[in-house]
C-alpha cells in the first residue's frame, strides 16, 4: 500500500493544472499529521518489531536527506575550490609581473648608478664626451643619491616562490597583507621616481653636452653644415622628448581609466557572485521545503491508506460493533458532504462579496474624480462648450474674410510693382544676351577656323602616312602569300607522315603478335620434347641488353619469355608491354636530341650493338650434347652454326652500313647547322622544316624496308617449320626466336629513335607554326594599322563635314538670333500693351473691393441671425438635459431592482440544490432501511464512476494531461493507434506524451 501511495503522490505531483497544484500545496503545508496507528497487537514483540520498522523507515528518510545534502555540499565545495584556484592563479600572475617590474626598475637604477660613478670621475681634457658602451648617454656626476641602497622593508620578496607567497597570504591577516602590499607599492613608487629623476638628469646632461659642442664649435673651425645638423638634431630630440612625455601622460590617464573600469567590472562580478550564492541558498531552502512537502504527502498518503483499510474492515465486519462503525463512517461522510457544500457556498458568497467590493471601489473612485473635476473646472471644458465654439466660429469667419481682402489688396499692389520691375529687367537681360551672343558667335567662328586649319594639316599627314603604309603592304604581300602556301603544304605533309607512322605502328603490332604466337608454339614444342637439348640454349638464357647497357632496347629477357610461354593467355600481356615499350621515354628523346648535337654518340651506339649480340651468342658456354644423338644431327648442328655465323656477318655488315649512314647524316647535320647559323631567321625556319621533312621521309623508308625484311623472314621461317621434322622445326624456331628477338630489339631501338626524331620534327614544326602565327599576327597588326589609318581618314573627312555643317548652323543661328531680337522687340511692345491692360484691371479690382466690403456687411448680419438661432438651440438643449437627469434615477432604481432579483434567484437556486441533495439522501434512507445497503448502493455509484465511460467494462486507469479526463488505458491507446486522437468528452486533441497511467487504490 505504501508503494501505491507513493505512485499516487507522484502522479498527483506530475499531473493536474497549476491552480490545483497551488491549492494542494497550500493544503499540504497546513496538514496535521495524526499519530501512527500500529493496529492490532498481541504481544510486546510485535510492538518492538513495528517500532523498529517505523524507526528504520524514518532513518532511511533521514539518510536520503543526508545524502542529498552531502551531494549539494560536495558540489559547492568543488565550486569554491575552483574559485580559489582561479584566485590563486590571478594572485600569482600579479605577484610575478610585479616582481618582474621591480627587477627591471632595480636593473635600471643599477645601470644609472654605474653611469653616475663613471661620470663622477674627472674627465681628461682631450677625451670626447659621448655615450657609454651600452649606447646610453653619461649622467651627471651628482647622482650620489641614486647609489644609496633602498630600505629593506621597501624591497619586494623577488626570490620568494609562488607557493610560499600563497601560503604567506593565507597565513597572514588582512591588515598584515594590506601593510605588506602598501610597503611594496611605496617601494615601486620610489623606484619609479628614481628612474624618472635619473632620466631627467640624463636629459640635462645631454643638453649640457650639446651646449659644450656648440661652444667648442664656436671656438674651433667647424663647417656650417655640421652646426646646422647638430641644431636640427637638438630640436628633433626636444620634439621627441615632448612627444614621449605627452604619450606617457596619455598612457597614464588611459591606464587609470582602465583600472577604474576594471574595478567596476570586478565589483559587478562580485555582486553577480553574491547574487549567485543567494540564489543557491534560496534553491537550498526550496529543496528543503520540497522535501518537507514530499514527506508530508507521504504521511498523508499513508494515513489515507490506513483510513481506507479501516473503512473496508468495518464494512466487511458484522455484529453490533460493526454497525456502530458504519454509522460513524456514514456520519463522517455526511459531515464531509456538508462541509464541501458549505465550502462551495462560502466560495460563491466570497466571489459575490469581492465583486460588490470592486464595484463599490470603482463607484467611490468615479465619485471622487467627478468631485475633483467639479472643483477645478479647466479652461478646456469652457472652450468645449457650444456657446464658446459658436462665438469663436463667427469671429474667425469675419477675421479670415478681412485678412483675405487685405491680402488681395497687397497682392494687387505687389503684382503691379512686380510687372513693372520684371519688364525693365527683361529689357536689360535681352540687351545683355544680345551682346553675349554676338561675342560668343565671334569666338566660335574663330575657333572653327582654327580647328579647320588643324584638321586639314592632320588630313594631309594621315594621307601621306596611308600612302607609305599602302606601298609597304604591297611589297610585303607576295612574301606573306608564299609563306602561307609553304606553311599549308608543310602541314599537309606532316599529316601524311603521321598517318604513315600510325599505319607502320599497326603493322609492327601485328608482327609482334605473330612473334608472340610463334613463341607460344615453340615453347609448347619444347615442353613436348624435353629430352632434346639445344646447343645454344645456354646462349639464349643470357639477358638481352636493356636500356641500362646501351640505350633503348627491349626490356623482356629470354628467361621471362620461357616463363610466360606455357600460358597462352599471356601473349596479350606481352604485346601490351611491348606496345608500352614502343612509346619513347623521356630519356630516349633526350638522347636523340643530344645525338643531333653530338653525332659521335650515335656513331658509337651501332658499334656497341654487334658486340652485345656476339656476347649473347657466345654466352657462358654451350651445353653438352645428348648421349643418344646421331652423327647426322652433329652435321646439322655444324651447318646450323655456320649459318648462324653467316647471319652474324650479315648483321655486322648491316650495322656497319648503318654506321656509315649515321656518319653521313652527322655530316649533313653539321652542314645544316652551319647553314642554319648563317641564314636569316625566315630561311632558317624553312631549312629546318625541309631537313626535318627529309629526315622523316628517310626514317619512314627505313621502317618500311625493315618491316618487309621481317615479313620475308617470318615467311621463310614458317616454311622451314612446315617442311622439316619436329626437332629441326624446334631448333629452327628457337634460332628464329633468338634472331627475331635481336631484330625486334634493334627495330624497337630504331623505332624509338624514329619516334623521338618524329617528336623533334613535330616540335620543330610547332615552333615553325608559332613563328608563322607571329608573322600572321604581324600581318594582322599591319592590316589593323592600315584599317585604323583608313578609319582615321574617314573620321577626318567626317569631322571636316561636321565642321562645315556646324559653320552653316552657326550662320543660321546668327540669322535666328537676329530674328529673335526682332521678336523680343515685338514682345516689348506687347508687354507695354499688357501694362496698360493691367492698370485697367487694377481699377476693376478696386471696384471689386468695394463690392466685397458690402458683402462683408451682409455676412455680419447673417452672423447675428445665427447667434440668435444658437440661443434657441441652447434653450432646447437645457430642456433635454433636465429631462435626462429626471430619467437617470429611474434607470438606477430599475438596475438595482434587477440586480436584487438576480441575487435572490441565485440564492433560491442554491437553496433548491441543497434541499434536493438532502431529499435524495432522505429517500435513500427511506428506501434502504439498513446502513449496509446504503453503503453498498454508494459503492455501486462509486464503481460506476470509476468505470470507463467508453467501454463501461474496465476501470479508469489512464488520464489525459490536456483536459484531465480519466478513461481506461486500453481505450486511450486504441484511440491513439486508430488515429482518433481526441478526448471522447471534450474533443481535445492529445499526443503520444499526453496520457499516462494512474493508480486508484
Curated annotation (Swiss-Prot):
Reactions catalysed, as given in the entry: S-ubiquitinyl-[E2 ubiquitin-conjugating enzyme]-L-cysteine + [acceptor protein]-L-lysine = [E2 ubiquitin-conjugating enzyme]-L-cysteine + N(6)-ubiquitinyl-[acceptor protein]-L-lysine
Q: Name one GO cellular component term.
A: HULC complex
Per UniProt, the enzyme's principal EC class comes to transferase
Q: Where is the composition biased (Basic and acidic residues)?
A: 18-28, 602-619, 633-646
Q: Which residues form a coiled coil?
A: 45-91, 228-377, 437-523, 627-946
Segments carrying the region annotation (Disordered) are 1-31, 116-149, 516-646
Q: Where are the zinc fingers (RING-type)?
A: 948-987
Tell me where in this chain the PTM N6-acetyllysine is found: 20, 355, 517
Predominant subcellular localization, coarse grouping: nucleus
Involved pathway(s): Protein modification; protein ubiquitination
Q: Write down the SMART domains for this protein, in alphabetical order.
A: RING
InterPro entries according to UniProt: E3_ubiquit_lig_Bre1 (IPR013956), Znf_C3HC4_RING-type (IPR018957), Znf_RING (IPR001841), Znf_RING/FYVE/PHD (IPR013083), Znf_RING_CS (IPR017907)
Give the E.C. number(s).
2.3.2.27
Which Gene Ontology BP annotations are present? chromatin organization; positive regulation of transcription by RNA polymerase II; protein ubiquitination
Q: Which keywords, in A-to-Z order, does the entry hold?
A: Acetylation, Chromatin regulator, Coiled coil, Isopeptide bond, Metal-binding, Nucleus, Phosphoprotein, Transferase, Ubl conjugation, Ubl conjugation pathway, Zinc, Zinc-finger
As for subcellular location, the record says:
Nucleus
KW Membrane (keyword) present: no
**Residue ranges under compositional bias (Polar residues)?**
520-531
For the keyword Zinc, the answer is yes
GO MF annotation list:
protein homodimerization activity; ubiquitin protein ligase activity; ubiquitin protein ligase binding; zinc ion binding
A Pfam match is: zf-C3HC4
Subunit arrangement? Component of the RNF20/40 complex (also known as BRE1 complex) probably composed of 2 copies of RNF20/BRE1A and 2 copies of RNF40/BRE1B. Interacts with UBE2E1/UBCH6. Interacts with RB1 and WAC.
What protein family is recorded?
Answer: Belongs to the BRE1 family.
Q: What is this protein called?
A: E3 ubiquitin-protein ligase BRE1B
Amino acid at each position: 500500500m505504501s508503494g501505491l501511495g507513493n505512485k499516487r503522490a507522484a502522479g498527483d505531483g506530475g499531473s493536474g493544472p497549476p491552480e490545483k497544484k497551488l491549492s494542494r500545496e497550500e493544503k499540504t503545508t497546513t496538514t496535521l499529521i495524526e499519530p501512527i496507528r500500529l493496529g492490532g497487537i498481541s504481544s510486546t514483540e510485535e510492538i518492538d518489531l513495528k517500532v523498529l520498522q517505523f524507526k528504520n523507515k524514518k532513518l532511511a528518510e533521514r539518510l536520503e536527506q543526508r545524502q542529498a545534502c552531502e551531494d549539494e555540499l560536495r558540489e559547492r565545495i568543488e565550486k569554491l575550490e575552483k574559485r580559489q584556484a582561479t584566485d590563486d592563479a590571478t594572485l600569482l600572475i600579479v605577484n610575478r609581473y610585479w616582481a618582474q617590474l621591480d627587477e627591471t626598475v632595480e636593473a635600471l637604477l643599477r645601470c644609472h648608478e654605474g653611469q653616475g660613478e663613471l661620470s663622477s670621475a674627472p674627465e681628461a681634457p682631450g677625451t670626447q664626451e659621448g655615450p657609454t658602451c651600452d649606447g646610453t648617454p653619461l649622467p651627471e656626476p651628482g647622482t650620489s643619491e641614486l647609489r644609496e641602497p633602498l630600505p629593506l622593508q621597501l624591497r619586494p620578496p623577488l626570490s620568494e616562490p609562488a607557493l610560499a607567497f600563497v601560503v604567506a597570504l593565507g597565513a597572514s591577516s588582512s591588515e598584515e597583507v594590506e601593510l605588506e602590499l602598501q610597503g611594496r607599492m611605496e617601494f615601486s613608487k620610489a623606484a619609479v621616481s628614481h628612474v624618472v629623476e635619473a632620466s631627467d638628469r640624463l636629459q640635462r646632461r645631454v643638453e649640457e653636452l650639446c651646449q659644450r659642442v656648440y661652444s667648442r664649435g664656436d671656438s674651433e673651425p667647424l663647417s656650417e653644415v655640421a652646426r646646422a645638423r647638430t641644431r636640427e638634431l637638438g630640436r628633433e630630440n626636444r620634439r621627441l622628448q615632448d612627444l614621449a612625455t605627452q604619450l606617457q601622460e596619455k598612457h597614464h590617464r588611459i591606464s587609470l581609466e582602465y583600472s577604474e573600469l576594471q574595478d567596476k567590472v570586478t565589483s559587478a562580478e562580485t555582486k553577480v557572485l553574491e547574487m549567485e550564492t543567494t540564489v543557491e541558498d534560496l534553491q537550498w531552502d526550496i529543496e528543503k521545503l520540497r522535501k518537507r512537502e514530499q514527506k508530508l504527502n507521504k504521511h498523508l498518503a499513508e494515513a489515507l491508506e490506513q483510513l481506507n483499510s479501516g473503512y473496508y474492515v468495518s464494512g466487511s465486519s458484522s455484529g453490533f460493533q460493526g454497525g456502530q462503525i458504519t454509522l460513524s463512517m456514514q456520519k463522517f461522510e455526511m459531515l464531509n458532504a456538508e462541509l464541501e457544500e458549505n465550502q462551495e457556498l462560502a466560495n460563491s458568497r466570497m466571489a459575490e462579496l469581492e465583486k460588490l467590493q470592486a464595484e463599490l471601489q470603482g463607484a467611490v473612485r468615479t465619485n471622487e474624480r467627478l468631485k475633483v473635476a467639479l472643483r477645478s473646472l479647466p479652461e478646456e471644458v469652457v472652450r468645449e462648450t457650444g456657446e464658446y465654439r459658436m462665438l469663436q466660429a463667427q469671429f474667425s469667419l469675419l477675421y479670415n474674410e478681412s485678412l483675405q481682402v487685405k491680402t488681395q489688396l497687397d497682392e494687387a499692389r505687389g503684382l503691379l510693382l512686380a510687372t513693372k520691375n520684371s519688364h525693365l529687367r527683361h529689357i536689360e537681360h535681352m540687351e545683355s544676351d544680345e551682346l553675349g551672343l554676338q561675342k560668343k558667335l565671334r569666338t566660335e567662328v574663330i575657333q572653327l577656323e582654327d580647328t579647320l586649319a588643324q584638321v586639314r594639316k592632320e588630313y594631309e599627314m594621315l594621307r601621306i602616312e596611308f600612302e607609305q603604309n599602302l606601298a609597304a603592304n604591297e611589297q610585303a604581300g607576295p612574301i606573306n602569300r608564299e609563306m602561307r602556301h609553304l606553311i599549308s603544304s608543310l602541314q599537309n605533309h606532316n599529316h601524311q607522315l603521321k598517318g604513315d607512322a600510325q599505319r607502320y605502328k599497326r603493322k609492327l603490332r601485328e608482327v609482334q603478335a605473330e612473334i608472340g604466337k610463334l613463341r607460344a608454339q615453340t615453347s609448347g614444342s619444347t615442353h613436348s620434347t624435353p629430352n632434346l637439348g639445344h646447343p645454344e640454349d645456354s646462349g639464349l638464357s643470357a639477358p638481352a641488353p636493356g636500356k641500362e647497357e646501351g640505350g633503348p632496347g627491349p626490356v623482356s629477357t629470354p628467361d621471362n619469355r620461357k616463363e610466360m610461354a606455357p600460358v597462352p593467355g599471356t601473349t596479350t600481356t606481352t604485346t601490351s608491354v611491348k606496345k608500352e615499350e614502343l612509346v619513347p621515354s623521356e630519356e630516349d628523346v633526350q638522347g636523340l636530341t643530344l645525338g643531333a648535337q653530338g653525332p659521335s654518340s650515335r656513331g658509337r651506339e651501332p658499334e656497341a650493338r654487334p658486340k652485345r649480340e656476339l656476347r649473347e651468342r657466345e654466352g657462358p658456354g654451350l651445353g653438352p650434347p645428348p648421349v643418344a644423338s646421331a652423327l647426322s644431327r652433329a652435321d646439322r648442328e655444324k651447318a646450323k652454326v655456320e649459318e648462324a655465323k653467316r647471319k652474324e656477318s650479315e648483321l655486322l655488315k648491316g650495322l656497319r652500313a648503318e654506321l656509315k649512314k649515321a656518319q653521313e647524316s652527322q655530316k649533313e647535320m653539321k652542314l645544316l647547322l652551319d647553314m642554319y647559323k648563317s641564314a636569316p631567321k625566315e630561311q632558317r625556319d624553312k631549312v629546318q622544316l625541309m631537313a626535318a621533312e627529309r629526315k622523316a621521309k628517310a626514317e619512314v623508308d627505313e621502317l618500311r624496308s625493315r618491316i618487309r625484311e621481317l615479313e620475308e623472314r617470318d615467311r621463310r621461317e614458317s616454311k622451314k617449320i612446315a617442311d622439316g621434322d619436329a626437332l629441326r622445326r624446334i631448333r629452327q624456331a628457337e634460332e628464329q626466336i633468338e634472331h627475331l628477338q635481336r631484330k625486334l630489339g634493334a627495330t624497337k631501338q630504331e623505332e624509338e629513335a624514329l619516334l623521338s626524331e618524329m617528336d623533334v620534327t613535330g616540335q620543330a614544326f610547332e615552333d615553325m607554326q608559332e613563328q608563322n602565327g607571329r608573322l600572321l599576327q604581324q600581318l594582322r597588326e599591319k592590316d589593323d594599322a592600315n584599317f585604323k589609318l583608313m578609319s582615321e581618314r574617314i573620321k577626318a573627312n567626317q569631322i571636316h563635314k561636321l565642321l562645315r555643317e556646324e559653320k552653316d548652323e552657326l550662320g543660321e543661328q546668327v540669322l535666328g538670333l537676329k530674328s529673335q531680337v526682332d521678336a523680343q522687340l515685338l514682345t516689348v511692345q506687347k508687354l507695354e500693351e499688357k501694362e496698360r491692360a493691367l492698370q485697367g484691371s487694377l481699377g476693376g479690382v478696386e471696384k471689386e473691393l468695394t463690392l466685397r466690403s458690402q458683402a462683408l456687411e451682409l455676412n455680419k448680419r447673417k452672423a447675428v441671425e445665427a447667434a440668435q438661432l444658437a440661443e434657441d438651440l441652447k434653450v432646447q438643449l437645457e430642456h433635454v438635459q433636465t429631462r435626462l437627469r429626471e430619467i437617470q434615477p429611474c434607470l438606477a432604481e430599475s438596475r438595482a431592482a434587477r440586480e436584487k432579483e438576480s441575487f435572490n434567484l441565485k440564492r433560491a437556486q442554491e437553496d433548491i440544490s441543497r434541499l434536493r441533495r438532502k431529499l435524495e439522501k432522505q429517500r435513500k434512507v427511506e428506501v434502504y432501511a439498513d446502513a449496509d445497503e446504503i453503503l453498498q448502493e454508494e459503492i455501486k455509484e462509486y464503481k460506476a464512476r470509476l468505470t470507463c465511460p467508453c467501454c463501461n467494462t474496465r476501470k479508469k486507469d489512464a488520464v489525459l494531461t490536456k483536459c484531465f479526463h480519466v478513461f481506461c488505458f486500453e481505450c486511450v491507446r486504441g484511440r491513439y493507434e486508430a488515429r482518433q486522437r481526441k478526448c471522447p468528452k471534450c474533443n481535445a486533441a492529445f499526443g503520444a506524451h499526453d496520457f499516462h497511467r494512474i493508480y486508484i487504490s
